[in-house]
Amino acid sequence: MVKDRVLLTGASGSMGNAAFLELLKRRDKYDIVLLVRPSEKNRKYFTKYLGIKSLGTINKSVNEVNGFKIVWGDLINPDDVFRAVDGCDYVLHPAALISPAADHNPRMAREVNFEGTKNVIAAIRKQQNRGDNTKLVYVGSVAEYGDRLPPIHRIRVGDPIIPSIYDFYATTKIAAERAVIESGLKYWVSIRQTFIGIPKALTLLDPIMFHQPLAQHIELITDKDAGYGLVQCLDAPEGFWGNIYNMSGGPSCRFVYWEYLRNMMNLLGMGDYRRIMDRNWFCLRNFHGGWFEDSYVLDDFLHHWRSNLDDHFTQVKGFRFWYSYLVKVIPKFFVKIYLKRMVMSKNGPLYWIESNNEGRIKAFFGSKKKWKDIPSWEVDGSKFTGEGYLLYHGFDENKLDTELGLEDLKEAARFRGGECLSERFIDMKTKLKWKCAFGHSFEGSPTLVLKGGHWCPDCDAPPWGYDKIAAKNPFFAQVYYANHGNDENYFYGAESFENIL
């Protein structure tokens, strides 16, 4: 029996490793190829699956045993990527440099996330029939949607793509997704992944946890379900391909951030989070997260909704490190000192306040006065009551793709403050000509614009000139004005990451 060959990138990450372990269960159906960086840690971990006992016997570039192949290389090296892609029927591509690492090295994030994805596309194009026999699953991010605090926390595919200010990770994922959608590949999908709840939760203790507003609505997925869903793409039907999806664990995995903090801090032995953290340590806006209104669409294909929020907490409880027990007996005063050191680091909100970092204060709080006005825990202001509302996409979404016409595209362009310059609409994949409100002309398929929420690449961040864009683009303004004033006028430069190094 001839097996399909599957390339998996990012096998050392949370989603990727879960996918790797799931693929191992299906070796009767698939040969496995990994593209893995040749670090000592990776070599020790992955070579045991090759049956190699001594690291000294490992080939420097490629090892292959019984249908399991490891290409030791890097996404940013086109030759390494081609060696991995060559001969594969499927490419599962979750590899990425994520935050907070991406915040500190946005140039490397762009190389890995964007240029690396372009290398994957190019390698597929070099295959037989220009890659028409190879299917690509690209993993995007909920971060592409940007700041979606209530009442706009209900997210759908097709909503505006607006990365939060300073979120360099999101900007690279957006650029990479655009490249995938417009690649011309016959078989592709983009899966916008939500927050992955990992068992080793203490490893997430980082200043970035304070960037998240307490009222943020979030819908997580466990690492096992994320990896399982990724591998399930291998069995997806023809109608699955050529689309964009939101991936999460479903409604049973929804929560509000302050609730998650309460449960997680208790679970980790830290007790009442209000005793170890001050309320004004947390930002008021400018992160990402929401509840996916349409994640059921992907689950209908992949059937990956297997775990709920309680299952996640059970996994965390099972993986608690020894020092989580020690925390229980340490006076909470010392725990608070430890956490305050975190929030006072260069990427921490209190450091921005004390150093008068105008850009960060403006982006994450609105103003220093608004930070000063944050009440104590005694005042209940972190809850949101109400269902929120869905965003308008600028055209009749009740129409099937086959029912859309040129006037629908022109209507959508007008709602974005621009124009559709083309006078002929062929299909959802064929690129058309558009113009944005600032006069930039560009090409993009209806799938990219109407179904993906993308718009003008010249206006894409970085830099972030959102106040001017929102003034001319009603589609964009739906998100931006939900927690920004229409009198704001601020510009955030592309090099603004340097003030947190």
Predicted regions and their residues:
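Catalytic helix-loop patch of NAD(P)-dependent Rossmann-fold dehydrogenases
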Residues: 111, 144-188, 211-215
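Glycine-rich NAD(P)-binding loop of the Rossmann-fold in SDR/ketoreductase-type enzymes
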Residues: 76, 104, 108-119, 163, ...
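Mid/C-terminal beta-alpha module of Rossmann-like enzyme folds, strongest
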Residues: 229-296, 300-389
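N-terminal Rossmann NAD(P)H-binding glycine-rich loop of SDR-like oxidoreductase domains
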Residues: 4-26
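Substrate-positioning beta->alpha
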Residues: 211-235, 242-243
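NAD(P)H-binding glycine-rich loop region in Rossmannoid oxidoreductase-like domains
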Residues: 61-115
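Conserved Rossmann-fold NAD(P)-dependent oxidoreductase catalytic core, especially the SDR/UDP-sugar
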Residues: 97, 118-166, 189
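Functional cation/ligand-contacting sites centered on basic and imidazole/sulfhydryl donors
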Residues: 373-501
